[in-house]
Amino acid sequence: MYGETTLNKNHVIKFIKLKINNCLGCDEVEINFSKADNVHIIIYSLVTDMAKDLPAVTPVAQAILLLCSLTYPDSDSLETIPQLKIGKGSVSMSFKVYPVNKEEETEPESESDLDEGPSTSKQALERMVQRAERKAKEASTRNVHSKGIYVNVERRFDMYFALDTVSYYINGGKRQSCPLPEFHAKFFVRPQHSINLLRQLHEKCSGNWLKVIQSDGDGDAFKKFKDPDSPFETFVKLFESNPIKPNDMMGKLAKTCLHVNEAVRLTEREFILEVFNQVRHIFEYITAQEYTVWFLVPCLGDKDQLRSKTLEDFDLTKVRTSIRRAGDTSNIWWDHTDHNIKDILLVAFQLDLATHVNQSVLVISHLETLAEFSTMQYVTAFFMNDFYAKKNTEPKWICHRYLERIIDVALFLGVIVIIEYPSAFTLLQEGRHLIKCFQKENADSSRTSQWEIFEDVVKENESDLEFLKEAVGKVQQNV
């Protein structure tokens, strides 16, 4: 069952435990993941700023990427992690894989189908045997689907010859070793779009998300577009040889190839429009319908204005992204949009693309601007309501729980999402499990940084600002 079989399709993965041993700025850290759902929140604070092109900031998220993604597949990529020193340490994780392919589950059969019509003693005995075998098969299937399989995986950094290798065992069985890509192909699905590529969108693509969707996530987003006027056209030389005599079979083959190519091209266009539409829905939900996003797709030059438009009539190479406030008809182009709203649109694209490619693990990071905006909005609402809206009948200042809404979308889409959030003001519901990572001043100059990591939960008064209000009151009295 576990040989060459790929287990990542039609399965759900549940993280159980993560261990970081003498690496990534940690001595020994053990984290137990929440059993409630697959969205894990990491609250962190930094002493020194991290590079914006790092896929993850905290040791916890970096360890997850080291084990559950192909972000760092070899020694060269490992050297890009500033907190990782090659030559010591390891990271390990345990997770559970649940099969969810309903089509392969054995449905309970009616017992009456074996009892129709008269039967001899021999036939009755045969039916009893069949019924027992059927029930045993159903019980076995239910047992597998309820238990799933446990996987323990470790990646070590103290063996220079095996930096691209992981060791793992399934259900406590024999330990096996294999290259990281092989392990990843067995349990996880590779993300098709680089977060760094998305972040460079407004610099390279001027708001044209089409180029991001069509890019493979490696390098320049424009490299696939040799003809900017028709990015979906792929011209293939079917025959590159001397002229050949007409042949009915060759003609039919060429015609079939053209039909298939046309169907693929139209499917690509439908996919892009579907992504745009779903991103709009996600974006509107996270912003509480205060904003919407329009993807303005111009039509190709067509003199026949009366003819109904089809997918062929749109120029998908010149898509413009316009973010609008609810009820506003003016265009706010991507480059002129508030940075906090840009962050939300970026998150919306990540969530949607992760579901389209059946991505198992998604890390959302670098939400500093969104966190700052949410914190200031909350502080403003707190003080304005306290000083100017004391009566229940008076209008109230509000603040939006953007992070809570991002979690709602992630839960709905069913992807394992790791969210790194650089603020204690999460405004999350009481009781949600948190992983807190606080960077500390260097006690030893030989270490790049030290981290304090522990588990916590959202408390009822976690976002209480009474202490700040008292401090402001004392300052005003002194003045």
UniProtKB/Swiss-Prot annotation:
Biased segments, Basic and acidic residues type: 124-140
General function of this protein: Essential for proper maintenance of sister-chromatid cohesion in both male and female meiosis. Mutations in ord cause premature separation of the sister chromatids in meiosis I and random segregation in both meiotic divisions. Required for chiasma maintenance in female meiosis. Mutations in ord reduce recombination in female meiosis.
UniProt name for this protein: Protein ORD
One GO cellular component, as annotated: female germ cell nucleus
Skewed-composition ranges (Acidic residues): 104-116
Main location class: nucleus
This protein's record includes keyword Flavoprotein: no
GO process annotations (BP): chromosome segregation; female meiosis sister chromatid cohesion; gamete generation; maintenance of protein location in nucleus; male meiosis chromosome segregation; male meiosis sister chromatid cohesion; meiotic cell cycle; meiotic sister chromatid cohesion
Oligomer status and interactors: Interacts with Sce.
Region (Disordered) location: 102-140
UniProt keywords, alphabetically: Centromere, Chromosome, Meiosis, Nucleus
Lineage: Eukaryota, Metazoa, Ecdysozoa, Arthropoda, Hexapoda
Record flagged with keyword Nucleus: yes
Subcellular location, record wording: Nucleus; Chromosome; Chromosome, Centromere
